[in-house]
């Protein structure tokens, strides 16, 4: 009995040691075993021995091969097309395919045995098995070859454990088999090859200076394309003599630029590219090859490392301008105001021409917050792609059109692995509404993050591993082999232009100096910096290679270096007296717009729309095609809206919004609304996209208003705030004539994108002179829903307000909402708008407007009067101004709480004044209004806790206004919730008690 128990264990040990047998091969093992049971001589002797050892317990091994019972058999589905695509473990299929081919060749006399006679059946079987083993070995190189590639220029990286996965012996080949030609059916570009011939191609392709990861890609066409592009006897990295000299020239420029600045500005921060100079010829190759394949524009985003080099050597920014900035000079013309930013954050744009193809390059300005520029670049690229097609386009732009604009992102290794926004952007890459036909990611992998070693900055072997989740091909390459780097850049560009998918280049290099030039890296990385000090520069190494090839002499190289240094000296002299004279931020799509230089000017814009036009739009908003099956609740919604249009009364929030969108679209302004659940609206209020209840077809009334209108896009975004808001901000930078809106699901969640608000939206214009008309809709209001569904943290945005940088509003009527949205497009400048939007007011009986309030001479009102003044037949009648005892100023939904409480109590000597726009603060308008009530007590009422909401922001402004009008009461009294750590209570009883308390305080 004991013997029988041991037999399957032994067999399982044999099975476990056979590395190419795993769960995916269960079918193959079963098929072989079935053959063996019928006729033991029909299988290879090794398999015969293996199966013989199983005794009667084959089921045990079969189970072992199949894996656990809960896995789904035959999943994932194998891609069994051509042989190249069938190499994913379905070996039975491969063997059958090869056997059939060999039989065909034998029949034609093309395949002969060792004696020169036609192949026997046994020889065909043996040859087929040789083929399968060879293909298994080839597949192993494709899967794991990158782990054995020569990637680290310093040679410090630990070699991975070698499990002999790539050894021919592992696949049953002994040295005695090395001279035998094996049929591999044009895999590796050869029909027949010996084992050494295969190894030569495989090692050169997968274990040289480039390591390619692509076997995680599920699309057989993409995988086959990469194999076809890099495998084969004629697929070596090869450049013409002119190409090699061009690479050398660019390397000399890159290295010489850094060395020149190091001499002239010793110790000044420049975040040099020293050690990663191969980036510069690689970027040139991307632009050049892209241009040949139809690329028109590149939008770049990058961190500080090497930025000045990219600006000057790739973007063509004048060196004298950079030297002027190093001297401390401004990058803006004298007549332009702005707070400025450090030189390694600034953007630029230029046109480059290669082989007659002109490509426009723009480098996006960015903060030091790593990787946050990524979504901004993607959004900018998307807008530029849309502009290529036009504002009246259909909603689906072909990816082949989008591919004409390339987002190109440069990353640091530690940041790419560490920052969550990277994964968010990868998540956006394939989504409708956010696709950009593939971003090219270039990681400058200097194997350190400030002072942090890779072992402490990521849990995966490579910084690029996060990109595997979207099946992006990854090209790891040794930065000290410039030809390999340029080749990788070329293939990566071709892949992106062919498949319109993201692609990653991971260039292993090093950082010759510290994190910045005033830093001492040996404190924390002594061994690495010992190796770096002894290591030749990339220019030295490549120069020696070209000298050995007889292409150049040392004198040629010295002359090239001297000429470049002389050019830089000339630019340095010119930089002493350089004056910037071109303000490029109002070029191109921004032509015709201006900066808003006078905070006191009238900024209403012509936002009213004739009633006739509004009714025409309203009619189209409620029409659906005859054969379209609308949900019955939606039909009721449409019927109610139709009544509003007929009567011109009772216009609610969502209808006013749709009329604003529709009127702008008819006037030629595209609308782009993005965020979680925006098609329907978080509170089921919007319904701008209708779904057929029978077949789920979509119908968008706002895109069916009239011929030639601009497009309306509502994009239900992924569940991210940071990347999506960054993306929409980027979009608004490229198309100032599109109304771009981002809506938070609840305003509480907007702080997931706080970096974008802080570094871009609130400060981008002052730092980089880049305007944005982005609208942020943040649902806000205290209704007893708890601390996570009550507050958009209005105070945060108000704290960011200064220097006329953005607008913050908390409006209370659909009409004012209509006008403030249209105002974004109806002025000749752009400012971001942060809107606290309502929840309960969406269906509040008092929060309604009339069509008359959207038309005629109407416009946005920063202050709104007390409704009781002109709703004469409703509720209480207010006393005359002189008899008003108290003025309660407020903003947002709390107005309606105050109004209803006052009505309930019959109070007629308290006036409610709404501040609809909190910033820019309407000081002059308030002076005019409050002058009527000089003797009244002044109260500021808010529903937010005292340390939140508008109180801290508005108090000094109101004090200034009261002093100005010589009011009896010089201080404003606070009425609202007491200061709190958490924004709101989650208990309805407590919420109502707090509400009653502060209403009593405000009105009593």
Swiss-Prot record:
Q: Which PANTHER family match?
A: 2-OXOADIPATE DEHYDROGENASE COMPLEX COMPONENT E1 (PTHR23152:SF4), 2-OXOGLUTARATE DEHYDROGENASE (PTHR23152)
Subunit comment for this entry?
Answer: Homodimer. Part of the 2-oxoglutarate dehydrogenase (OGDH) complex composed of E1 (2-oxoglutarate dehydrogenase), E2 (dihydrolipoamide succinyltransferase) and E3 (dihydrolipoamide dehydrogenase); the complex contains multiple copies of the three enzymatic components (E1, E2 and E3).
Can you quote a single GO CC term? Answer: oxoglutarate dehydrogenase complex
Please tell me whether the keyword Disulfide bond is annotated for this protein. no
Query: Tell me, which GO biological process terms does this entry list?
Result: glycolytic process; tricarboxylic acid cycle
Per the record, the coiled-coil ranges are none
> In Gene Ontology terms, what is one molecular function of this protein?
oxoglutarate dehydrogenase (succinyl-transferring) activity
Against InterPro entries, the record matches this protein to:
2-oxogl_dehyd_N (IPR032106), 2oxoglutarate_DH_E1 (IPR011603), 2oxoglutarate_DH_E1_bac (IPR023784), DH_E1 (IPR001017), KGD_C_sf (IPR042179), ODO-1/KGD_C (IPR031717), THDP-binding (IPR029061), Transketolase-like_Pyr-bd (IPR005475)
- What are the required cofactors? thiamine diphosphate
Q: Which family does it belong to?
A: Belongs to the alpha-ketoglutarate dehydrogenase family.
Q: What is this protein called?
A: 2-oxoglutarate dehydrogenase E1 component
The entry's function note states: E1 component of the 2-oxoglutarate dehydrogenase (OGDH) complex which catalyzes the decarboxylation of 2-oxoglutarate, the first step in the conversion of 2-oxoglutarate to succinyl-CoA and CO(2).
NCBIfam families, per database record: 2oxo_dh_E1 (TIGR00239), PRK09404.1 (NF006914), PRK12270.1 (NF008907)
**SUPFAM superfamilies in the record, alphabetically?**
Thiamin diphosphate-binding fold (THDP-binding) (SSF52518)
Keyword terms, alphabetized: Glycolysis, Oxidoreductase, Thiamine pyrophosphate
Q: What does the organism's lineage look like at the top? A: Bacteria, Pseudomonadati, Pseudomonadota, Alphaproteobacteria, Hyphomicrobiales
Reactions mediated catalytically: N(6)-[(R)-lipoyl]-L-lysyl-[protein] + 2-oxoglutarate + H(+) = N(6)-[(R)-S(8)-succinyldihydrolipoyl]-L-lysyl-[protein] + CO2
Enzyme Commission code(s) on record: 1.2.4.2
Q: What class of enzyme is it?
A: oxidoreductase
